[in-house]
Structures are given as structure tokens and as C-alpha cells.
Amino acid sequence: MASFSEEAMDSYMYPAYNPYSYRYMTPKNKGMSWRQKNYLASYGDTGDYYDNYQRAQLKAILSQVNPNLTPRLRKANTRDVGVQVNPRQDASVQCSLGPRTLLRRRPGALRKPQQSPPEQGSPASPTKTVRFPRTIAVYSPVAAGRLAPFQDKGENLSEKTEALRSEGSRGEGGRPEGKQEDGEIKEQTKMDKADQEEVAPDQTRPKFQFLEQKYGYYHCKDCNIRWESAYVWCVQGTNKVYFKQFCRTCQKSYNPYRVEDIMCQSCKQTRCMCPVKLRHVDPKRPHRQDLCGRCKGKRLSCDSTFSFKYII
């Protein structure tokens, strides 16, 4: 019996094939220098290679002893990456799905919603789970909480209306059913009208304002100086000046007494379409009649009206 077991173990421990009988295909390593000509220089890690080879040998031996025996599972060769983000600022993160933007936490997200007291005999209502906004687009007004100010207000208004309805129904418990329903309908119509009046001015008032450049005329009464400027930053679509200009002598801030769109005098276009264009002037000292749009594409151009920046 001993000789039979020794022969069997010899066949298990010494495989019939030679492990170095075939040729190894050496893959090309991109980061390897042409001067490195060692035998095992092409492999990324020789320890991993020999570990895999020994594991294959063990698997072959165990399959001969018992097909059900398999080597223990080992930890996968993966790497975990953690990202720490300031909750008060937006941060762009590269993940497996592509570039994503982690939005800052809204100030009203941590406030507890108004909960009505539980009724008698009913179990305690579970707490609401916190819902985080989805990442829709980087430049979408729905993506950030500060660009969508109406969502929180709508949720607060709906919670207030529900609380008022529950309190009104409990306070009017002794009334008849018909009168109680009429009172609820009247209160509901009043609350809906009040909510519409509160939300309407907020919706008309934008949270961010785009700026555009216009041409303005200034006049300082103290110094009796008049000057022009083609770089008056106004709110888009209006003549409201966002940044004031200072007088060159007394350094007082003044608003222009007249603001116009930057356009050519002859063709009345922001980009001149005249066959014979006027000469290009210095953008630092422009003149009204010489703004022709020939400096398009430059950092300081006469006909650039829109800005990619917005003021919150």
C-alpha cells in the first residue's frame, strides 16, 4: 500500500509535461526602454507571473485528485478609488460612466420637513428618506439647486397646505359634514390664490443675469467732460448698466445718459455688412462711426456683445 501511494503521489507531484517546453510570447511593454534587454524585463511583474503559473499547477493536481476540489479564491487585483468633495462647492469627478459633476448640498436639504402629529391609535410614521438631485447636465438650470429656486419653494408650499388642511379638519370636527366640506373648499381656494401670488413674482425674477456690451455716452457735470465707451456692461435685453464708469479727472462714478447697441451707422447691423468697410480702430479708444466689426475673434473686439460669464 505504501508503494502504491508513493507512486500515486509521485505522479501527482511531478507532472508529465515539461513546464519550459514551449516558447513564451513576450508582449511589448510600452514603458520599457530599448536598452533594457534582460530576460524577464518584458513582464510587468515576475512575481505575479510565477504566482499564476503555480496556481495553474495546483489546479491541475487538484483536478486529478478530486474534480470537486478547487483552490481558495483570492482577492481580485483591483483598486478602489475614493473621492472626498467639499459639500459646499461643486466638483467634477471622472468615474466609469464618464465625467460627472458632484453638486453642492443645498441649504434646505438638511431641514426637517413639517410633520403632522400622529393620530391616536396609529403607529409612528417613519422618517422620510433624503433624496439627492440627479446629475442631468453640467450647464442645465435643473442640475444645480441654486439655478432652480422654485423646486424647494413648491415643496415647502405643498407641505404647508397639507399641514393646514389636517389642522383645519381636526379643529372643525364638531361641525356637520356639509358645512365642513364647504369650509375646506373655501380655505383651499384661498390658499391656492395666496400661493400663486407668492410664487408669481419669484418666477418672473431671474436668479442669474447674462451681460452684454453696449455703447454708452457719459457726461461729468463737475468737470464738464463728455466721453464715449463701447464697453458698457448691461443686463441682456435691457439698458440697465451693471458696472459704472469713473470720470478720468475727478474719479466719480457715473451711469451713461444714453446706451445703444454696438452697430454700424450705415447698415445698422452689429456685424457690418457694408461692401466698403471703414478702417479698424483701436479698441481701447473706439469711436461710434468706426465700429465696423472687422476685429471679430480678438480678445477686445468692437462687435462682441455677449459674454460667457453670468452674475448670480
From Swiss-Prot:
A zinc finger (3CxxC-type) spans 214-297. Ovary. Signal peptide: none annotated. One of its GO terms (biological process) is oogenesis. Residues 79-133, 150-205 are annotated as: Disordered. Residues 86-95, 113-128 have a biased composition (Polar residues). Residues 152-196 have a biased composition (Basic and acidic residues). Its main location: cytoplasm. Keywords: Cytoplasm, Developmental protein, Differentiation, Metal-binding, Oogenesis, RNA-binding, Zinc, Zinc-finger. It is found in: Cytoplasm, Cytoplasmic ribonucleoprotein granule. It holds the Pfam family Zn_ribbon_3CxxC. GO terms for cellular component: cytoplasm; cytoplasmic ribonucleoprotein granule. Disordered regions undergo liquid-liquid phase separation (LLPS) for the formation of membraneless compartments that store maternal mRNAs in oocytes. Belongs to the ZAR1 family. mRNA-binding protein required for maternal mRNA storage, translation and degradation during oocyte maturation. Probably promotes formation of some phase-separated membraneless compartment that stores maternal mRNAs in oocytes: acts by undergoing liquid-liquid phase separation upon binding to maternal mRNAs. Binds to the 3'-UTR of maternal mRNAs in immature oocytes, inhibiting their translation. This is Zygote arrest protein 1.L. It comes from Xenopus laevis. The gene is zar1.L.
